[in-house]
């Protein structure tokens, strides 16, 4: 009892006792079981026997899992009651307040990291309560790409602060998870006022002048640009002084071992800034010595950037002026640069130099920028910069390189010079098919030939043979130049389409049917040989889904056929079998225009000719004549946007000529090299589905549309 009184919180899960003792000690039972039965209602239904039964189940003797030492505090002897107990195995109590605090911290961290990401700081792997080194989103760690940004996240995730320790950047700011963004602007620096005497500059000694002489820089140029020197211990370094309107604002030092450093807390400007104050043409180079080299070639209107080039072009948008710390020198010199109508960028020819050129052009406007291409040093190598050209080839070649500067490339804007090689190849006909490929019929070749990369729209009244004529022409193209084709023919079953193509290829009917007349059908051997040809020449595009295919779906499969099989032609037959879902506010005319633009881009990009079959609308008062292209159902864009427009019309009037006569009306030819407007007549062989030149050219009436104003 004394043991129980001392440890009232312990639950005895393994208790060895005598039931008789328990039954005989009513007070003991009431004392032990009071906490367990406190929740039961005091009702007669809960009898004493039921209580004892419950107690016996709870205090059922259980063998100990391991011996318990007699010295253990859990081993006690009482009057007539011997008991021992192992360490209780109960779950650790969960502190709900601690768990709630953890959830709050995690929620803050999610919010905080999202806000940091908006500032360009990736803090996904930065734990709270520690300082983490990251790439600065503003200066990107300079040329070396060092992790110069120190980020600290509060242990409770409530806030974060950052600071870039690079002197040229100084980005500093902070953000709170539950509040606004603290200032992330660069630290406001107080610009130092410096003088030649104050920073202890002195005239150049003979040794430094000899160094410049070896680099083809004259003493006169050094004096005009006020190049000086400074003694640091036992070493002499070159001092490039930065002046603005006669005031010394900064100084950059260069050791003979090519180590650079600048005066701290000074204004960053272009080197030689006063030389471009009254000029409309500016040359920008990458180093101070290159600026001096330009002067030796006769160009005084030249400036140099004060810092090294970046490793690569930034993929981010140009930041605002107050945040563009890496290129602050351009903003500081904007009053000078905005007057220039022509800016020649002559940075180094290596990767970082070209990246610097791109960053400068992005900020100053590419439309007024030109770029310099340095001359060749050898068969496989170009000179790197202006001073290297001056030292190796002299001032005349350097001047020539600057005068030959080319307009800076602008996406989507070209000069014809960019295409001279292509024009020469077109003139020499080195690519092939410049005149177009023969259709296989002499009567038609004078009017229409197949040019890679063009779109031909084919129309005609139903059952006039549009698909038959296209299939026959594809067979001719394969036989003559070996072209392959993708067929999106949605009105034909695959087996029927295969039969038609095999008949045209083998020149025999597929079946012993009435249409074959007395011509013997193709043999099994001929069929098997034709199947191989069929498999090597044509690639069906079939939509096996319940829905109709869209034009995007068809062009994606056609692109795959170009890359996988090398097709040179695509047939889309017909237009009205495609899925033409469009936005509620889009008219059919707008949709057709957009669709034809997609087809033409595919055709031109992959140098693949596309035949697009479009049915005419219902003809009113049709007199048996051929329709025209404006009769195509849907939009006038079918004729406006296509390169070639063709009408296929079959004669059904015995008085007008033979019934096997087919009129091929060429109604539009954009490329005069490929053909001209006119009519050609072919004879159709119903047995094999093939066409041949007709010896007669009868006049067949053409349906006229009302005059359009």
UniProtKB/Swiss-Prot annotation:
A single GO BP: DNA replication, synthesis of primer
SUPFAM superfamilies according to UniProt: DNA primase core, P-loop containing nucleoside triphosphate hydrolases
Molecular-function GO terms, alphabetical: 5'-3' DNA helicase activity; ATP binding; ATP hydrolysis activity; DNA helicase activity; DNA-directed RNA polymerase activity; metal ion binding; single-stranded DNA binding
Alphabetized Pfam families for the sequence: DnaB_C, Toprim_4
Residues where ATP binds: 460-467
Limits of the Toprim domain: 280-385
Residues annotated as binding Mg(2+) 2: 348, 350
Binding of Mg(2+) 1, residues: 286, 348
Cofactor note: Binds two Mg(2+) per subunit.
Superkingdom, taxonomy of origin: Eukaryota
Segment annotated as transit peptide: 1-16
A GO cellular component entry from the record: mitochondrion
Function comment: Has both DNA primase and DNA helicase activities and may be involved in organelle DNA replication. Capable of producing RNA primers of 9 to 18 bases from a single-stranded DNA template.
Protein name: Twinkle homolog protein, chloroplastic/mitochondrial
Organismal lineage: Eukaryota, Viridiplantae, Streptophyta, Embryophyta, Tracheophyta
